[in-house]
Amino acid sequence: MGMKFFNPVTPSSRGTVLVSKVGLSKDEPEKSLTSGKKSSGGRNNHGRITTRHRGGGHKKKYRVIDFKRNRSGQGIVEKIEYDPNRSGFLALISYKEDDIKSYILAPQGMKPGDVVTAGNDADILPGNCLLLKHIPVGSFVHNVELKPGNGAAIARAAGCYAQIVGRDGQYVLLRLRSGQIRLILSSCKATIGVVSNPDHKNRKLGKAGRSRWLGIRPTVRGIAMNPVDHPHGGGEGKTSGGRHPVTPWGVATKGKKTRRRNKSSDKYIKQLKG
């Protein structure tokens, strides 16, 4: 889609760079595939904040996405749509055989009129879904299942992909964007291609209000807080914090390992990140 650079005609437009929406449909989303969505504001079922810096934002309708791709037969791409709930774009697929529509994550390069299919005999083309054992080594895939039939769990954000780098018995070796190499059952499904909107990471929101529209609240530095609120808080005048950087709960940050030891999935990780 490319990027849209704004001229500095107002203070808030100075330096603003957003993803261009040229080529995306301006129609309302498919009504049968949308539902209401209540914002949690970062709270859990007890009302306690479990994720900081969440709250507010524009109202959103949830788009029901087909992450399992169980439907066989050819589908026609009707349009490419913006989805406020994720960074990648969506493709509305129409199956003429039974007159059913569904949303899938649009891979890079997909356009209205393209044909997609799912099944073991599908061609190796962007948007087609196959079992990992039928996809050639070296291919880029997204929407990868972790367990057969559970639906896609890996490589779903804008510009994300995983690469098949080898096979090991009933498993496939998959290199993730983080550099981690992981074993995935070859009976899991994956979709060919890279998720659309790779320029999402290059955008510059330009003003605080645009963050608030997205439901992102301000992040306050610990050094600017009081001692009761943060380990870095307090002190006379401006201070350095007086200790190595920590979280509000006193856990060391900036490089500390956060993965739990002896996780059951350790045996499926052949190479760590980086």
UniProtKB/Swiss-Prot annotation:
Region Disordered, residue ranges: 21-59, 224-274
UniProt-recorded Gene Ontology molecular function terms: rRNA binding; structural constituent of ribosome; transferase activity
Bias (Basic and acidic residues) ranges: 263-274
UniProt superkingdom: Bacteria
Entry GO CC: large ribosomal subunit
Family annotation (Gene3D superfamilies): 2.30.30.30, Nucleic acid-binding proteins, Ribosomal protein L2, domain 3
GO biological process, one term: translation
UniProt keyword annotation of Ribonucleoprotein present: yes
Family: Belongs to the universal ribosomal protein uL2 family.
Designated name of the protein: Large ribosomal subunit protein uL2
Species classification: Bacteria, Pseudomonadati, Pseudomonadota, Alphaproteobacteria, Rickettsiales
